[in-house]
C-alpha cells in the first residue's frame, strides 16, 4: 500500500513538532501543571492546563479537576493530522452510539449538550478525563477553532469504569461493558488498560462482540503520576482480548513517546500527545495525552465508518480501519480513508492480517547484497565479451602488418587502423 502524498506531507510537517512537545502528566488534579500546545512552526505554542487521567489516590480529600480558564486559539495538530474537516463532508457518525467507559461524562459540558446519556453515577465526572475523551469522539467544538470531535453526529453513552478518583478496576470495567451491551452500543471505547487478565472481563468482551459491538481499548496505561518500581506488563487488558482493537498513542512525528510502556499486539496508532479538548466545568480547554486519547479518536473514526456502512460487521469495520491506515511499524489511523476508500477482497484480507499482527519493517539487506553481486557478474561478463570482439578484429590486422605498429598520420583513429599510401 502506497502512502498518499498528503500523508507524506503530514509526517514531514510533524517531525519538527515532536521536540517542542511537553506531555501533560497525570498528576493530582489540584496540581496539574500547564502544558504547551505544539505550534505549527515547531516552536512552543500556547500554554494550556493538563488533563489528568486520575486523581491522587493518596490524597486525604478528593479535589476535582478545576475549570480551565484558557481557550485554545487554533486547531491542534491531531485534528489536522486526522483531516477532520474533510472527513465531515462524508460522515459525522450520525445515528451511531459510542459507549465510553472511563471516569464519566458530564452531559451538559461545553460542546456535548444533547449528545450524552449517562448511566448511574457516570454523569458526575470529578476527574474530567471521560468528558475530555467524549469531546474527542463527538464534541461539537462550540467556542473553539474547529475543535470538533471525529464524529460530532454520534451519541455518547457514558459509563463509569473507575472510582471517583479515576482508578479503574476489572469489576467496574466488566459491569460497564455489560451495560454497554444491554444498551446496544455500536462502538465501545475502554480507556482503562489493566495489567492482569480477568475471567469475567473476558466474558463481557466476548458478549459485547457477539452482540455486534466493536470494542476498542487502550493498548497501554496513560502516563503515570510518578515513578514506579513495577515492571510494565507485556499485555494489558481488555486490549489483549481476541477481537478487541488495541490502540496506542503517537507523537506528531508519527512515533510513540519515549516513556511509553512496552507492549505487544498493537493494531493501530492515533494522536495521543498535545491533544486539545474540553472538560466537565466551564468552557476552557485542556491538553491530554496517552493511549486513552488515541482510543477516543479511533472510536470516533469507527462511528464515522459505521454511520456510512451500517451493514458492516464490527470485524469488518476493524479491518477497514487497519487496512486504510497509513503504513508504518504500527499503522496510523486515517478516518477519512476509512470512510471513503473502496476495498476489494485483497484489501480486506490485508487489513485482517494487519489487525492480527503488528506490521514489521522488512529487512532488505540480503536482497540488496544479492542484487549487487548480480550486477557485478553482468559487468564482468560484458567486459569479457567486448575483449573477445576486440581480439577478433585487431589480431588479423596486426598479423597482416607483420606485427608492426600502425603508421601515424592517417585519417583514421589511432585505434581503428590507418589509410596506407
Regions found by a protein language model. Give the residues of each.
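C-terminal subdomain of the subtilisin-like protease fold in secreted/lumenal serine endopeptidases
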Residues: 309-421
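Subtilisin-like serine protease catalytic core
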Residues: 86-98, 105-116, 123-169, 262-265, ...
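Solvent-exposed loop/turn segments at secondary-structure junctions
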Residues: 103-107, 142-143, 162-166, 193-197, ...
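Substrate-binding/access-modulating region of protease and related hydrolase catalytic domains
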Residues: 163-237, 293
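Protease zymogen maturation seam
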Residues: 2, 14, 24-95
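Secretory targeting and sorting signals
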Residues: 1-33, 378-397
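Loop/turn elements at helix/coil->beta-strand transitions in domains of secreted/extracellular proteins
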Residues: 94-97, 153-155, 183-188, 210-215, ...
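Extracellular S/T/G-rich loop segment that most often corresponds to the catalytic His/Ser-adjacent loop
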Residues: 236-307
Amino acid at each position: 500500500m502506497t502512502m498518499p502524498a498528503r500523508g507524506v506531507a503530514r509526517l514531514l510537517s510533524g517531525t519538527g513538532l515532536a521536540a517542542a512537545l511537553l506531555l501533560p502528566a497525570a498528576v493530582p488534579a489540584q496540581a496539574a501543571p500547564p502544558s504547551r500546545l505544539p505550534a505549527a512552526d515547531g516552536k512552543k505554542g500556547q500554554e494550556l492546563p493538563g488533563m489528568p487521567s486520575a486523581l491522587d489516590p493518596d490524597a486525604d480529600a478528593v479535589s476535582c479537576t478545576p475549570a480551565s480558564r484558557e481557550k485554545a486559539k487554533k486547531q491542534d495538530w491531531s485534528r489536522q493530522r486526522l483531516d477532520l474537516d474533510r472527513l465531515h463532508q462524508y460522515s459525522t457518525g450520525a445515528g451511531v452510539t459510542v459507549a465510553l467507559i472511563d471516569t464519566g461524562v458530564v452531559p451538559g459540558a461545553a460542546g456535548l449538550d444533547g449528545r450524552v446519556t449517562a448511566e448511574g453515577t457516570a454523569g458526575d465526572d470529578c476527574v474530567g478525563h471521560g468528558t475530555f475523551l467524549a469531546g474527542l469522539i463527538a464534541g461539537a467544538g462550540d467556542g473553539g477553532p474547529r475543535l470538533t470531535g471525529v464524529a460530532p453526529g454520534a451519541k455518547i453513552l457514558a459509563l463509569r469504569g473507575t472510582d471517583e478518583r479515576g482508578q479503574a478496576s476489572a469489576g467496574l470495567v466488566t459491569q460497564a461493558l455489560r451495560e454497554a451491551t444491554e444498551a446496544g452500543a455500536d462502538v465501545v471505547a475502554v480507556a482503562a488498560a489493566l495489567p492482569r487478565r480477568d475471567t469475567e472481563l473476558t466474558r463481557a468482551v466476548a458478549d459485547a462482540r457477539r452482540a455486534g459491538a466493536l470494542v476498542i481499548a487502550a493498548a497501554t496505561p496513560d502516563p503515570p503520576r510518578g515513578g514506579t518500581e513495577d515492571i510494565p506488563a507485556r499485555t494489558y487488558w481488555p486490549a489483549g482480548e481476541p477481537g478487541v482493537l488495541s490502540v496506542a498513542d503517537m507523537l506528531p512525528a508519527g512515533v510513540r513517546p519515549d516513556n511509553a510502556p512496552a507492549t505487544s499486539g498493537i493494531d493501530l496508532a492515533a494522536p495521543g500527545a498535545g491533544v486539545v479538548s474540553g472538560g466537565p466545568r466551564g468552557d476552557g480547554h485542556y491538553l491530554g495525552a496517552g493511549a486513552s486519547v488515541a482510543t477516543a479518536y479511533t472510536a470516533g473514526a469507527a462511528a464515522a465508518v459505521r454511520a456510512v456502512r451500517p451493514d458492516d460487521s464490527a470485524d469488518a469495520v476493524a479491518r477497514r480501519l487497519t487496512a486504510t491506515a497509513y503504513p508504518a511499524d504500527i499503522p496510523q489511523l486515517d478516518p477519512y480513508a476509512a470512510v471513503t476508500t473502496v476495498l476489494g477482497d485483497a484489501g480486506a484480507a490485508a487489513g485482517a492480517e494487519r489487525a492480527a499482527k503488528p506490521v514489521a519493517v522488512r529487512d532488505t539487506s540480503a536482497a540488496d547484497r544479492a542484487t549487487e553481486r548480480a550486477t557485478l557478474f553482468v559487468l564482468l561478463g560484458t567486459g569479457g565479451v567486448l575483449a573477445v570482439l576486440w581480439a577478433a578484429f585487431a589480431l588479423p590486422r596486426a598479423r597482416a602488418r607483420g606485427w608492426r605498429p600502425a603508421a601515424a598520420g592517417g585519417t583514421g583513429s589511432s585505434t581503428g587502423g590507418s589509410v596506407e599510401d
